[in-house]
């Protein structure tokens, strides 16, 4: 059973968020070591474990084992939802293959039925969002309802939406301005992945108007990032492509 931070009121611990991984366990293991993960740390993985680099099955094996030893919360990314459909045997389109699915499809050619089922179970158990006792929201992508996550009509928005990040970037209004976006008033802080910060020319986590994006481009030329949300310290892997020198990732 996962015990959340408010259930450990007398223990000093870090709450760490981990950005998009995209089938790169080598980079994840490297950054976990650099962050010097301790037994009492609470790790919130923001999703997109699948698609991109060649080791999605190995990554899911690692995460399944890792949660037995560490306090982890795993959120659902859009690529995880797609990978789940693939493992169920649903027809997958060319667009999925072009955006990292081809590597996943190839990686599962020789994976046993037992492992596939374990991965399916893991992906089925992912959470769409997490709201902590300090009103800090964690989810892969965003939400669209102006009253917040409890009122979202389409749960897919939690792992597909990009408008929250676009609004956070583009808003130059004061929070006291009557036109300040409602979505940015609801939560103390919001932590997301989904849209690489490398699109803005940075391989570091970026924050705008209370929304912090920890997807630092691991699927492309960037890194995997772990951030301590209380101190804002962060650790990064090497550029992921340097750990997979014979692969393209999603650099197509």
What do the PLM-derived regions correspond to, one by one?
Residues 2-11, 33-36, 65-67, 130-132, ...:
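A short acidic-Thr-Gly-centered motif at the start of a beta-strand
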Residues 14-22, 136-142, 212-214:
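Active-site-proximal beta-strand elements of phosphoester/diester hydrolases
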Residues 115-139, 144, 149-199:
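His/acidic metal-ligating clusters that form di-metal
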Residues 1-62:
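N-terminal active-site segment of His-dependent metallophosphoesterases
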Residues 22-27, 51-54, 80-84, 131, ...:
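Active-site environment of divalent metal-dependent phosphoester hydrolases
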Residues 52-132, 159-172:
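Active-site neighborhood of divalent metal-dependent phosphoester bond hydrolases
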Residues 20, 43, 48, 77-78, ...:
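Divalent metal-coordination and catalytic microenvironments
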Residues 174-242:
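Conserved beta-sheet core of the metallophosphoesterase superfamily
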């Amino acid at each position: 059973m996962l015990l959340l931070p408010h259930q450990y009121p007398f223990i000093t611990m870090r709450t760490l968020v981990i950005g998009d991984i995209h089938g790169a366990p080598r980079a994840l293991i490297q950054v976990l070591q650099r962050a010097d993960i301790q037994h009492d740390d609470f790790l919130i993985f923001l999703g997109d474990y699948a698609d991109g680099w060649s080791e999605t099955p190995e990554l899911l094996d690692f995460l399944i084992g890792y949660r037995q030893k560490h306090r982890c919360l795993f959120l659902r990314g859009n690529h995880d939802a797609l990978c789940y459909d693939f493992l169920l045997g649903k027809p997958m389109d060319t667009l999925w293959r072009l955006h990292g699915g081809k590597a996943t499809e190839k990686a599962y050619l020789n994976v046993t039925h037992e492992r596939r089922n374990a991965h399916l179970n893991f992906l089925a158990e992912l959470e769409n969002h997490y709201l902590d006792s300090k009103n800090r929201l964690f989810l892969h992508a965003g939400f669209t309802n102006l009253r917040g996550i409890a009122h979202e009509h389409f749960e897919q928005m939690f792992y597909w939406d990009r408008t929250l990040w676009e609004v956070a970037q583009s808003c130059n209004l004061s929070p006291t301005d009557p036109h300040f976006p409602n979505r940015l008033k609801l939560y103390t802080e919001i932590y997301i992945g989904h849209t690489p910060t490398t699109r803005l020319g940075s391989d570091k986590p970026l924050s705008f108007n209370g929304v912090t994006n920890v997807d630092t481009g691991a699927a492309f030329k960037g890194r995997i990032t772990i951030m301590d949300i209380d101190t804002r310290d962060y650790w990064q892997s090497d550029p992921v492509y340097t750990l997979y020198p014979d692969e393209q990732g999603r650099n197509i």
